């Protein structure tokens, strides 16, 4: 065994000990949900015509979490669910991208963690060429927006490998370059100008939602319209329709973003069923946030556990082409993973950004009916108008979802 093989084996052993892949053994009879789609908990039988001589061909894929020959059956997960999970766009930290200028004043430096400040001074004198250590909420927000756009462009049943050119064009909008309309550069620029968030500072759900709203509007018809609640999980129909309706009066595809806080240090148990129901709605495009000081993108649930995509992996930035060059198959693969991760709801941070994609009038009516009939305590309320709600008041409002603090 050569040194490369030894290094790979060591990496796999360390990962197995400190960050083992979850097994379907805690709630083996509970249905698995992924953004509104339900999967039977028991895996389908799959076979792999793999001989010992061919095993080495899959080592790189196994480490990247992209191989079809993996531990899906051994860990008890149905292949249909894992394929759906793998097809979701996974935005992560990136390195070696064009610098994001930093502000050289005490006010700008104060919000940064000590580690990021030292790294910036030593390695990035012209600005940030990586978002490692501070960009996870932006990446989670990009993931939410990208998957909403993916659903609009290619459909909810799309799976990785199909219509690669269309996917590549979508991903190019999020390239780590100042000219890409939905890049981290654009998020940071708008955050500094309009949200009081300096380059290198961790974004909260509220600032992320406002960036998504503004940047999507600048994209025209490429991105959906965006309705952002005022740091609450209350949705006002009159306000939503002003955003969603076109000149003809029909509802256009609209992304609903609700920034909320479901507790103080952890998600209050009374909201557990309501939060799980969020990812079971067919309009769901996921949840960004939800992990103390480390944002993730949550897309699935089984029992009390939530499945998520973790942005805390640093990969080289994908080159941005102004002449329309499409991403290669290898470059596209860096936006996907079969590596399942999950967390118990009691360990989630209560501050989060919840997203829904409403496509048309029927979808809007369906969504309203579903959020009003969830099991357990509701976390989302829909009202006709903000003024009427203010004048009438609402019994028990102080006992419900807390306003979001994005400080």
From Swiss-Prot:
The answer to whether UniProt assigns keyword Acetylation to this entry is: no
Q: Please name the catalytic residues of this protein.
A: 136 (nucleophile), 310, 312
Protein's cellular compartments: Cytoplasm; Nucleus; Preautophagosomal structure
Q: Can you provide one Gene Ontology molecular function annotated for this UniProt record? A: cysteine-type endopeptidase activity
This protein's superkingdom?
A: Eukaryota
What is its EC class? hydrolase
Q: What's one GO BP annotation on this UniProt entry?
A: asexual sporulation resulting in formation of a cellular spore
* Pfam families the record matches: Peptidase_C54
Q: What is its main location?
A: cytoplasm
Please list the reactions this protein catalyses: [protein]-C-terminal L-amino acid-glycyl-phosphatidylethanolamide + H2O = [protein]-C-terminal L-amino acid-glycine + a 1,2-diacyl-sn-glycero-3-phosphoethanolamine
**Gene ablation phenotype (knockout):** Impairs autophagy.
CC annotations in GO:
nucleus; phagophore assembly site
Keywords of the record, alphabetical order, are:
Autophagy, Cytoplasm, Hydrolase, Nucleus, Protease, Protein transport, Thiol protease, Transport
**Which SUPFAM superfamilies does the protein's record reference?**
Cysteine proteinases
Known EC number(s)? Answer: 3.4.22.-
Function of the molecule: Cysteine protease that is required for autophagy. Plays a key role in cytoplasm to vacuole transport (Cvt) and autophagy by mediating both proteolytic activation and delipidation of atg8. The protease activity is required for proteolytic activation of atg8 by the cleavage of the C-terminal amino acid of atg8 to reveal a C-terminal glycine. Azg8 ubiquitin-like activity requires the exposure of the glycine at the C-terminus for its conjugation to phosphatidylethanolamine (PE) and its insertion to membranes, which is necessary for autophagy.
Hey, which family's this protein in? Belongs to the peptidase C54 family.
Name of the protein described by the UniProt record: Probable cysteine protease atg4
